[in-house]
Structures are given as structure tokens and as C-alpha cells.
């Protein structure tokens, strides 16, 4: 069974064949958790795809919000991406060093959030690219600024107030994509000061399950994604909101669902960094 929206995911071969096309822009979106010991900017400077610019989710954010990498205003997003040479008419290809593409999926979602649908994730990311012996560089490009028209689609994002209200209304199903131990409250959170557990009524589908570890962590097939959703008790006919630790890996699940035709998935941007960091939110363990 093919993907319903295959244009959202491109292969390393496709990128190798099209990376020199005048409308294609490669975007390195690498991000690591605070306790990883590495940073995206450092890894980008070491090696990246030829011509790729670096999109830092800790820079393209709402600087006034204490929560990690919350979405910026449309004006800030437009200002940041135009300086990266990303604009109207570009076919934007996102990838990361992480394997799987969760950080790339966050940037994919952000571009769609701000009205740019011609965007895709390179399946398998840099690890797959390197495993195939494809070229990388440490040269930093100097992009020419382009115009980017940003129009935010507010239906694609949820606030904590909306999630709190939803606990009673149950209008939407919340899919928590953190690892099972974190969901159950038996494993610690990577950020200090977070309570453990999950939101009442949330479903758990760990985002890592959506990747194939034996194939450089490429996205699983449409059949496999549907089977995983069914196993988790997720009803694809219901309105869905994905949540994670800080709004990054939630976007990988949104990408997976988008690929199989579920296009209206929203992201709880604050995710567990917000929910687990407060004392007035209900938690189940």
C-alpha cells in the first residue's frame, strides 16, 4: 500500500539527483536533547550535505517564551528563513544528523504551519546518506536572501489551555509519542524539574516505533504505520493532537500520519516541557 501523501518524504537518491536543481533548497535541521553532549550547530559545522543551510530550532523560536523552541510569530519566522535563502517557490528538503528525522520533521511542520507546503523530509537523514557513501562538506554557504510569505495556520497547533479544556470535552485524542517508560512515569525525563507520567486520556505511540532501525531508521511503510496506530488504540477518524517532550518528535508522528492521509493532525507545542513542568496540570502514572 503506497503512502497517500508521498511528496512529504523523499529518498536520499532523489536528493542526490535533484540537489543542484535551481528551486531545491537543502536544510540541515539537526537538534539534540540538552543532556546529549552535542549540539546541532556544532555537528552542522563538521559536516553536512553540499549547499545545505542550517535551521536552528533554538533560534527560530519565540524568544520571549521560557519553554524550549516554541513557535515564533509569522513575522519572526519569515525574517529568519529569508536570511537562510529560503523563500516562496522553493522546494525545501529537510534532514538531520539524528537518524529517523524527528528534528527535520519539526521544521517540515513549521514550514507547513506558516503556509509553505512544498517541503519534504529526506528519509533516513544524514546517517543513511553517509552509509551510502554520498558526499558531505564543511563549507558554509552564503545564501542570498529571498522573500518568504508567512501565513500561520492556527489549526495546526494547540496551547495548554486547549489541551486542558480537551480533558473534559474529549473533542480530540492526544497521542503522546514519548518512550513508554516516560509515558508510564517509570523512566526519568531528560529535562530537570519535570514531573513524570502522562495526560489523562492520552494514547502512547513512541515515535521511535515509526522508524525501521534495520534500514537506517527510515520511515515505516503505510501498512506498518496503520498497524502501529491500531495497536495503540488510535482512531484515525478522530481529530488528533500529538505531544512529546518539547514539540519536536511529536512532529515525526504528525509526518507519519500525514503520509497515510491524516492531514489535520495538530501539535501541542509546549508538550511535556510545559505540562510536566507545572504543578497545576493533571497527571496519570
Feature map (PLM): residue ranges:
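Cytosolic catalytic domains that perform sulfur/thiol-centered chemistry
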Residues: 1-285
Amino acid at each position: 500500500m503506497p503512502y497517500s501523501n508521498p511528496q512529504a518524504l523523499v529518498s536520499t537518491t532523489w536528493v542526490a539527483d535533484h540537489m543542484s536543481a535551481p528551486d531545491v533548497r537543502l536544510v540541515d535541521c539537526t537538534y539534540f536533547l540538552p543532556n546529549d553532549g552535542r549540539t546541532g550547530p556544532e555537528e552542522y559545522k563538521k559536516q553536512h550535505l553540499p549547499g545545505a543551510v542550517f535551521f536552528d530550532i533554538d533560534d527560530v523560536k519565540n524568544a520571549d517564551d521560557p519553554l524550549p523552541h516554541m513557535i515564533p510569530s509569522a513575522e519572526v519566522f519569515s525574517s529568519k528563513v529569508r536570511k537562510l535563502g529560503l523563500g516562496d517557490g522553493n522546494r525545501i528538503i529537510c534532514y538531520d544528523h539524528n537518524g529517523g528525522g524527528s528534528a527535520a520533521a519539526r521544521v517540515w511542520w513549521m514550514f507547513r504551519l506558516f503556509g509553505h507546503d512544498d517541503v519534504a523530509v529526506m528519509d533516513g537523514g544524514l546517517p543513511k546518506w553517509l552509509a551510502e557513501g554520498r558526499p558531505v562538506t564543511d563549507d558554509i554557504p552564503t545564501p542570498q536572501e529571498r522573500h518568504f510569505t508567512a501565513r500561520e495556520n492556527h489549526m495546526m497547533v494547540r496551547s495548554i489551555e486547549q489541551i486542558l479544556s480537551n480533558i473534559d470535552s474529549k473533542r480530540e485524542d492526544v497521542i503522546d509519542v514519548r518512550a513508554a517508560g516516560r509515558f508510564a512515569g517509570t523512566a526519568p525525563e531528560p529535562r530537570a524539574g519535570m514531573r513524570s507520567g502522562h495526560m489523562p486520556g492520552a494514547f502512547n505511540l513512541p515515535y521511535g516505533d515509526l522508524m525501521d532501525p534495520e534500514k537506517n531508521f527510515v520511515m515505516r511503510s503505510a501498512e506498518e504505520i496503520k498497524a502501529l496506530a491500531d495497536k495503540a488504540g488510535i482512531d484515525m477518524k478522530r481529530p488528533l493532537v500529538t505531544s512529546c517532550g518539547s514539540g519536536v518528535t511529536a512532529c515525526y508522528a504528525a509526518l507519519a500520519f500525514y503520509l497515510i492521509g491524516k492531514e489535520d493532525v495538530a501539535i501541542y507545542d509546549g508538550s511535556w516541557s510545559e505540562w510536566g513542568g507545572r504543578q497545576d496540570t493533571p497527571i496519570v502514572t
